[in-house]
A protein has these predicted regions:
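Short coil-to-beta transition motif at edge beta-strands of beta-rich domains
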Residues: 1-13, 21
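Short coil/loop residues immediately preceding or within conserved phosphate-binding loops
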Residues: 5, 17, 60
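Residue-level detector of beta-strand structural context in well-folded domains
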Residues: 6-8, 31, 63
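Acidic/polar residues in short coil/turn loops that connect beta-strands
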Residues: 12-14, 37, 69
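Short beta-strand-centered aromatic/proline hotspots
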Residues: 16-28
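Short, solvent-exposed secondary-structure boundary/capping segments
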Residues: 29-39
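Intrinsically disordered, low-complexity, charged/polar segments
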Residues: 40-80
């Protein structure tokens, strides 16, 4: 299960493999996102609560990972 502070490994778009600490979850589509119980949620202005990110918007979610060489960014698809 993904949690902030966990060690994660991912492969970027050119095939380089990185490992590091998951530090933040971000989104191009939503202003306020969080990681809870391994699921990304966003603040819904309509319902006034956090709700899971819809499947069609999963591509807008990415994660900040602190590696030994600096900060890297990865999507769900790049984790292994």
């Amino acid at each position: 299960m993904l949690k902030i502070g966990n060690e994660v490994s991912f492969k970027n778009e050119v095939g380089d493999i990185f490992s590091g600490e998951l530090t933040e979850v971000l989104s191009d589509s939503y202003d306020d996102v969080r990681l809870r119980n391994g699921e990304v949620e966003y603040w819904s202005k309509k319902t006034k609560k956090y709700v899971p990110v819809r499947e069609k918007h999963e591509d807008s979610v990415f994660f900040e990972i602190k590696t030994s060489t600096g900060l890297e960014y990865a999507s769900f698809k790049e984790f292994f």
